[in-house]
């Protein structure tokens, strides 16, 4: 299949493989007039033994696909909530390879829900592009977003991903310069991740009118789905953004429930996960009300 992210543009790399799970999921959602709910969680948080179960619970409570953060010691784009989640995961001994093993375990029971890895380039470079992408394919990863890899410098990495039928996802923000914006729209696959706020994850102020304007402008330039993250915390913001975007990405509002708990306290972990699932139910209901 050939895929043309930019309207009327030619693909940089010829893609003859079937649709990815991400592409298939968005096609299904579009046919059902539904919006994608994409939770973000940090691999190994609150502890490695609970993480795979957390992924399955997210699906049961309405996740259409899941972004899994790769723990890193210097997460420049992460706000305090997500950064602390990474610290907890690292303290528990979770490495990039461990994260991939968790995805592989998830895949033993779930072969449908797309998994997108979100992280930073340094751990990937240590493993090596080819080895990393091979491990991702073996584990059942569907897409990768490297926060600090500009599209103009992603050629080799992009080729590896394309050869293995995985989507490479990039960020667009209110401050993205025109040249960078064009590069993102040219190279991106799966979906556009639009950062709704100026700042790091978990920032507080969300201007839904501005987001709506920006999303509409992006949609005029690409056929890719546009999903919005940063600042979505509740049903009100989910519904306001979901009315214009193809999906919403929610991280800090979920991950914050693992803050300040004892990761070895089974009851505390279970209680935190119940709060996360209650939030998922709230967000799912809000999005589904848009197509009711």
Predicted regions mapped to residue ranges:
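Glycine-rich phosphate-binding active-site loops on the catalytic face of alpha/beta enzymes
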Residues: 66-73, 143-145, 150, 194-202, ...
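Catalytic cores of alpha/beta
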Residues: 49-56, 176-185, 232-248
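Alpha-helix-loop-beta-strand connector modules within alpha/beta enzyme cores
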Residues: 81-116, 159-169, 173, 211-226, ...
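Hydrophobic faces of well-ordered beta-strands that scaffold small-molecule active sites
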Residues: 37-41, 66-68, 115-119, 144-146, ...
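Glycine-rich, proline-tolerant flexible connector loops at the mouths of alpha/beta enzymes
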Residues: 45-48, 66-96, 196-203, 258-259
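Active-site-adjacent beta->alpha loops and helix N-cap segments on the catalytic face
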Residues: 20-24, 28, 74-82, 94-103, ...
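Alpha/beta catalytic cores of nucleotide-metabolism and tRNA/nucleoside-modifying enzymes
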Residues: 19, 214-222, 233-239, 243-292
């Amino acid at each position: 299949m050939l895929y043309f992210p930019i309207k009327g543009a030619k693909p940089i790399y010829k893609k003859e493989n079937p649709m990815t799970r991400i592409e298939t999921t968005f096609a299904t959602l579009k046919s059902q007039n539904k919006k994608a709910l994409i939770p973000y969680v940090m691999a190994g948080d609150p502890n490695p033994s609970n993480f795979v179960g957390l992924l399955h619970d997210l699906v049961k409570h309405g996740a259409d696909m899941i972004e899994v953060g790769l723990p890193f010691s210097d997460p420049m784009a992460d706000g305090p909530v997500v950064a602390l989640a990474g610290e907890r995961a690292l303290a528990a001994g979770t490495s990039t390879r461990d994260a991939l093993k968790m995805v592989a375990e998830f895949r033993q029971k779930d072969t449908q829900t797309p998994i997108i890895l979100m992280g930073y380039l340094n751990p990937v470079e240590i493993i090596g592009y080819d080895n990393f992408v091979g491990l991702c394919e073996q584990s059942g990863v569907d897409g990768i977003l490297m926060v600090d890899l500009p599209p103009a410098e992603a050629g080799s990495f992009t080729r590896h991903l394309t050869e293995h039928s995985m989507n490479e996802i990039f960020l667009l923000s209110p401050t993205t310069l025109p040249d960078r914006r064009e590069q993102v729209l040219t190279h991106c696959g799966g979906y556009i991740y639009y950062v709704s706020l100026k700042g790091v994850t978990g920032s507080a102020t969300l201007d839904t009118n501005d987001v709506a304007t920006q999303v509409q402008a992006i949609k005029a330039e690409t056929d890719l789905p546009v999903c919005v993250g940063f600042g979505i915390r509740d049903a009100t913001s989910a519904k306001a953004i979901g009315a214009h975007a193809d999906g919403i990405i929610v991280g800090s509002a979920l991950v914050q429930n693992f803050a300040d708990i004892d990761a070895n306290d089974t009851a505390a972990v279970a209680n935190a996960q119940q709060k996360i699932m209650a939030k998922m139910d709230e967000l799912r209901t809000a999005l589904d009300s848009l197509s009711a």
